[in-house]
Every structure is written in structure tokens, then in C-alpha cells.
From Swiss-Prot:
Compartments where located: Cell membrane
UniProt motif Selectivity filter: location: 395-400
Record text about domains: The segment S4 is probably the voltage-sensor and is characterized by a series of positively charged amino acids at every third position.
Function: Potassium channel subunit that does not form functional channels by itself. Modulates KCNB1 and KCNB2 channel activity by shifting the threshold for inactivation to more negative values and by slowing the rate of inactivation. Can down-regulate the channel activity of KCNB1, KCNB2, KCNC4 and KCND1, possibly by trapping them in intracellular membranes.
Protein name listed in UniProt: Potassium voltage-gated channel subfamily V member 1
PANTHER family with a match to the protein in the record: POTASSIUM VOLTAGE-GATED CHANNEL SUBFAMILY V MEMBER 1 (PTHR11537:SF38), VOLTAGE-GATED POTASSIUM CHANNEL (PTHR11537)
Family membership noted in the UniProt record: Belongs to the potassium channel family. V (TC 1.A.1.2) subfamily. Kv8.1/KCNV1 sub-subfamily.
Record region (Disordered): 1-20, 171-192
UniProt keywords, alphabetically: Cell membrane, Ion channel, Ion transport, Membrane, Potassium, Potassium channel, Potassium transport, Transmembrane, Transmembrane helix, Transport, Voltage-gated channel
Biased composition range(s): Low complexity: 10-20
Length: 503
């Protein structure tokens, strides 16, 4: 909109609602009452988002590094020296200016500006509850106010919400997901585009069709069967048919291999496909089997020592088959949320390990010197006391090593109590982050389902085919699902004792 003086409409008290006027102390800020600029040499008018405020240059001079403080200096220079003087232009600090009426225009939020006004009046900046942390930060940065100026009553809540917003970064992550989704589904280039697209939908979108849902269920069954089969093969029970278990292992590996190969053949950017974490997990789930076969086939003509080394390698490779459990992350929002939480909370996890390490080192040393004089004591060394301190601080308490003296029992009590306190500090933060990640992923899944339904509706309209999707029902379902998720989110937030989730 053109805000030049000749095109700008005149603002008077009738064109402004009561919420647009500011009633502050006239010695600091003056509110416009009749719509005409006040004839005060120390005041000038700012128009922020359609709301007019009359400010005092004297009050703004206390904040010379802010935008309005600099504007007050420029306005004073213009009044003294005139427009032809070598003074900065007010347009460098505002969006438009009317020197005749001494009014300066800013295309910013008038609601957030009231908090800025309060800061100029009292020197204390409070956080706007209705605005997310990152948007509020953008507003105060525009006005030249540092976020460290936030008052102590709002500072902790603001920085926690800001950290959560930056970590989740909902909009950026959604945009990245959409761009990646579009790049992977460009099947126009390459052979059999229609077949590849349908196959990709079945493999990667379990809710897109009945065939995709059936395929997802079968994939979960194969993962569960392979894990149970691996456990039974290690049990060495007399009634088990090992040959049947080996055949079942071959069948499961064949399924996993075919699933991975089909995904690999469908995508266009195969290098990007191999760098994705779920595909790396799929590859690690099948590679140990083939490496084991290769090692066993090449170990036929080696010595006994070499065969022992090969046997150890084969055992290690077989242990890696437990990674198949991670394949369930493709079908479980909870597992993906757990992975996101561990990735994002590495600082809290490191802090937890640091606290435990310090406590274990201190209490194990004290307990060792308290118990070493007892005959047949189980605290034979400080490393043995490490194990006792670890099980005590984590409240596991195996009981294989226990104190016998009164002093040792007092130390054990202090060790257990400190372990409870130490574990409670970062785990609360990790729990909040997990809840936020889980609800964010659920909202993304709802958005993806809505986008797929709209694409299907658009395609049906373009081809004049039968429309089986109702636009009203699509939006109604998406809104109801988001409301349900937000309700669960608020309930989870109340149960954790905080209100620190902003989306």
C-alpha cells in the first residue's frame, strides 16, 4: 500500500478504535485525542500499523541505540538544521514520513509495539503472550531492543520457548520435507514412470491405498518374525528345529532385500536416497547377513587360529541383526520422536552423564574407604565401588555389592538420594522435548494426509473422473485431528507442570 503523504488518508479519532489509542503519562508519551498533531516542540507522531502514538523526544533520548531513539535524534536535527543540512534522512529509520505533520510511518505490528512503548516508559520489557517467541524476537530486534532487556519475570519462559521453537523449526522442516517429497517423486524422467510412482506410494505411504496398508502390515510382521527368530536361534533349545529357523531367516532377509532394492530402483536421486537415515538402517539390517555368508564361505582353508577370529567376527555381525528393530521406525511415530529427541537433547544427555560421573566418582571413593577395613568386604577396590555407585544412583540396586558399616549405609543413602535428584533434573527437559517432537510429527502427518487428499481431488477434477473426495470433509477431518492433537498436547503440558509449548 502506498503510504506517501498525498495518497495517505487522514487519521482522526473517528477512524481509530479505542484500542488504537495509548493513554500513557503525558510527560513521557502523549496520546492523540482529536486526531491533529500536538503542537509540542518535544513531541512527534509515529504511525505503527495504523495506530498513531505521540512520543516524547526527551524520553527517547534515554535509549539512543534503539530505532526510535535514533529517530528522535534525526527529527531534532531536521528541526534545527533543516532538510538541506548534512543530517541522516528519517526514511533510513522508518517506512514513510510526513515532515509537515511531523508523522512517521512503520509497517509493523501495533500490538507488539505497545510492549515496546512500555519498555521506553519503564525500562522493562515484557513478553507478548499472544506472539510466538521467534516473532516477538523479530519485532524487538526491528526496534533495536536486545532480548537481554526482557524482564526477569518473563525471561526464563521466553528463552525456553525460543529454544523449543528453534529446535523444532516447524516451518523450515515442513518446507524441507515438501521439497524432498517433490524431488523424490519426480518420476517423469526414467522408464515406467507410472509403475514407479505407484510402487513408491505403496512402499513409502502406508495410508495412501489398501495395497499400501497391507504392505505396511506385512513389513511389520516380517520385522517382528525376524527378531523372534534371531532370539530363538540363540536359545539352543532341544525342541527347536534349527534348519527351519535358518530357512525362516533366509525368507526374512529376502523380503528386506527386495524391499530395499525396490525403493532404490524407484527414486531418481539415489545418492540422496542412500544418505537418508531410514535407508541406512535398512542397509545395516541386511548387510551383516551377506557379510556373514561371505566370511563363512572364505574361511574353509584357514588355520584354527584364523577360524577362531573368523568365528568372533561372525558373532559380532550376527549381533548387528538386532538393528532390524529400528526398521519399525518407518511405521511408528513414537520411535521417530525418540530419535528426534535424542538428536536434539544431546546437551541434556551429556549433562546427565556428567552429573552421574561426578556422583559415581565421589560416592564410590568414600564408600570404598568406609568399607575396606571390614573382613570379606565386597568393596575390594574403587572400580568395584564404581559398579555399586552406578546401580545405587540409578536406583537399580542389584544387591550383589552392599555396605555393612553404619557409615557405609549413610553414604549409600546419600548416594541414592543424590541419584534421584540428579536424574530428575534433565529428564524433565527431555520428557518435554519428546512430547513436543511427538505432537509435531503428528501434526505433520495430518498435514501430509490433507495435502494428499487435495492432490487426489485436484487430479480427479482435472480428468473429469468420479470425485470420491469431498473438500469439506477433508478440511473438517484435518481441523478435528489438529484440535484433538492440540488438546492432548495441552493435557501433556499440564501434567508436566509447564506451559512452554508454542507452535
Amino acid at each position: 500500500m502506498d503510504l506517501s503523504p498525498r495518497n495517505r488518508p487522514l487519521l482522526d479519532s473517528s477512524s481509530l478504535d479505542s484500542g488504537s489509542l495509548t493513554s500513557l503519562d503525558s510527560s513521557v508519551f502523549c496520546s492523540e485525542g482529536e486526531g491533529e498533531p500536538l503542537a509540542l516542540g518535544d513531541c512527534f507522531t509515529v504511525n505503527v500499523g495504523g495506530s498513531r502514538f505521540v512520543l516524547s523526544q526527551q524520553a527517547l533520548s534515554c535509549f539512543p541505540h534503539t530505532r526510535l531513539g535514533k529517530l528522535a535524534v534525526v527529527v531534532a536535527s531536521y528541526r534545527r538544521l533543516g532538510a538541506l543540512a548534512a543530517a541522516p534522512s528519517p526514511l533510513e529509520l522508518c517506512d514513510d514520513a510526513n515532515p509537515v505533520d511531523n508523522e512517521y510511518f512503520f509497517d509493523r505490528s501495533s500490538q507488539a509495539f505497545r510492549y515496546v512503548l512500555h519498555y521506553y516508559r519503564t525500562g522493562r520489557l515484557h513478553v507478548m503472550e499472544q506472539l510466538c517467541a521467534l516473532s516477538f524476537l523479530q519485532e524487538i530486534q526491528y526496534w533495536g531492543i536486545d532480548e537481554l532487556s526482557i524482564d526477569s519475570c518473563c525471561r526464563d519462559r521466553y528463552f525456553r520457548r525460543k529454544e523449543l521453537s528453534e529446535t523444532l523449526d516447524f516451518k523450515k522442516d515442513t518446507d524441507d520435507q515438501e521439497s524432498q517429497h517433490e524431488s523424490e517423486q519426480d518420476f517423469s524422467k526414467g522408464p515406467c514412470p507410472t509403475v514407479r510412482q505407484k510402487l513408491w506410494d505403496i512402499l513409502e505411504k502406508p495410508g495412501s491405498s489398501t495395497a499400501a496398508r497391507i504392505f505396511g502390515v506385512i513389513s511389520i510382521i516380517f520385522v517382528a518374525v525376524s527378531i523372534v527368530n534371531m532370539a530363538l536361534m540363540s536359545a539352543e533349545l532341544s525342541w527347536l528345529n534349527l534348519q527351519l529357523l535358518e530357512i525362516l531367516e533366509y525368507v526374512c532377509i529376502s523380503w528386506f532385500t527386495g524391499e530395499f532394492v525396490l525403493r532404490f530402483l524407484c527414486v531418481k536421486d539415489r545418492c540422496h536416497f542412500l544418505r537418508k537415515v531410514p535407508n541406512i538402517i535398512d542397509l545395516l539390517a541386511i548387510l551383516p547377513f551377506y557379510i556373514t555368508l561371505l566370511v563363512e564361505s572364505l574361511s574353509g582353508s584357514h588355520t584354527t587360529q584364523e577360524l577362531e577370529n573368523v568365528g568372533r567376527l561372525v558373532q559380532v555381525l550376527r549381533l548387528l541383526r538386532a538393528l532390524r528393530m529400528l526398521k519399525l521406525g518407518r511405521h511408528s511415530t513414537g520411535l521417530r520422536s525418540l530419535g528426534m529427541t535424542i538428536t536434539q537433547c544431546y546437551e541434556e544427555v551429556g549433562l546427565l552423564l556428567l552429573f552421574l560421573s561426578v556422583g559415581i566418582s565421589i560416592f564410590s571413593t568414600i564408600e570404598y574407604f568406609a568399607e575396606q577395613s571390614i573382613p570379606d568386604t565386597t568393596f575390594t577396590s574403587v572400580p568395584c565401588a564404581w559398579w555399586w555407585a552406578t546401580t545405587s544412583m540409578t536406583t537399580v540396586g542389584y544387591g550383589d555389592i552392599r555396605p555393612d558399616t553404619t557409615t557405609g549405609k549413610i553414604v549409600a543413602f546419600m548416594c541414592i538420594l543424590s541419584g534421584i535428584l540428579v536424574l530428575a533434573l534433565p529428564i524433565a527437559i527431555i520428557n518435554d522435548r519428546f512430547s513436543a517432537c511427538y505432537f509435531t510429527l503428528k501434526l505433520k502427518e495430518a498435514a501430509v494426509r490433507q495435502r494428499e487428499a487435495l492432490k487426489k481431488l485436484t487430479k480427479n477434477i482435472a480428468t473429469d473422473s468420479y470425485i470420491s473426495v469431498n473438500l469439506r470433509d477433508v478440511y473438517a477431518r484435518s481441523i478435528m485431528e489438529m484440535l484433538r492433537l492440540k488438546g492432548r498436547e495441552r493435557a501433556s503440558t499440564r501434567s508436566s507442570g509447564g506451559d512452554d509449548f508454542w507452535f
